[in-house]
Amino acid sequence: MSLDNVVEDIRDEARARAEDIRQDGQEQADEIVAEAEADAEELLESRKADVEQQLEREREQALSSAKLEAKQARLSARRDVLQRVREQVERELAELEGDRREELTRSLLDAAAVEFEDADEVSVYGRADDEELLSSILEDYDGYEFAGERDCLGGVVVEGSNSRVRVNNTFDSVLDTVWEDNLKEVSARLFDDQ
């Protein structure tokens, strides 16, 4: 075997080995590229899912916020309506006249008088505009006298001279009690709540 043949065999072997190395390198490169593409696709899908979840959370938050604002607006409107109804009732109580006003005032005084059966002197306070009415009613009660004005819609505040008892039977206090006790029913009637 000649030297040229040996050189040629070595070259062929080197070329074959180089081709094997190149093929191995290409296969490894193809695997790396395929893995990178798969990783990139997986990362892209993961990011898309994250973005979708974030968008869904933001949509839900926006919807919840809008619902809350709408509910607050409804509640505010209801409070305004209830306040106007309350003010209308107060106006009507303040404007009561004649027999109806006397009947209610006498009834409130009778209810308060139970607390002062042992009192010698009883002071009765009321609305300035009701002084004449109260003085007339008090003629039927021994030891009771009109003692002055109270800022109220009507009715009476009664105090005994020998006790620390004070009974507030004004239209205002009765309205407060009735309003609180019946607010749910009033609201249901006004707003058709179930």
Curated annotation (Swiss-Prot):
Superkingdom of origin organism: Archaea
Membrane topology: Peripheral membrane protein
Cellular component, GO annotation: plasma membrane; proton-transporting two-sector ATPase complex, catalytic domain
Compartment list: Cell membrane
Keywords per UniProt: ATP synthesis, Cell membrane, Hydrogen ion transport, Ion transport, Membrane, Transport
Disulfide bonds: none
Chief location of this protein within or outside the cell: membrane
A GO molecular function held by the record: ATP binding
Claim: NAD is one of the keywords in the record: no
One matching Pfam family: vATP-synt_E
UniProt-listed SUPFAM superfamilies: V-type ATPase subunit E-like
GO biological process, one term: proton motive force-driven plasma membrane ATP synthesis
Role summary: Component of the A-type ATP synthase that produces ATP from ADP in the presence of a proton gradient across the membrane.
Record family assignment: Belongs to the V-ATPase E subunit family.
Assembly: Has multiple subunits with at least A(3), B(3), C, D, E, F, H, I and proteolipid K(x).
Protein name (record): A-type ATP synthase subunit E
Source species of the chain: Haloferax volcanii (strain ATCC 29605 / DSM 3757 / JCM 8879 / NBRC 14742 / NCIMB 2012 / VKM B-1768 / DS2) (Halobacterium volcanii)
Gene that this sequence comes from: atpE
